[in-house]
Amino acid sequence: MKAEIYLNGPISCGIDVTDKFEEYAGGIYSEKKAFPLINHEISVVGYGLDEATNTEYWIARNSWGTYWGERGYFRIQMHTDNLSIERDCTAGIPSFTPNKAQKTQFYQ
């Protein structure tokens, strides 16, 4: 996940949203469920390290607006399967390479 984000930008991940998560207002989130169910999609845009606690975390953007979380974003602990964030991720990769020899035509 880190390599993909570093090289190509944000990735899409499914998570198991809970009532507790809906109330998130800041900090590094941590919640693991015994039987998770993916029910929401978010964009993982980066990662970091809290040096005070030596905790690695993902930085993700939610779709609930800037009033929620950390101005629409949240941090969630890495490597502990929190909300199943590391189980169901995808990255968009173009299936073509532009050919510079071909001219693009625009019609009006």
Language model: regions and residue ranges:
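Active-site signature of cysteine proteases
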Residues: 1-108
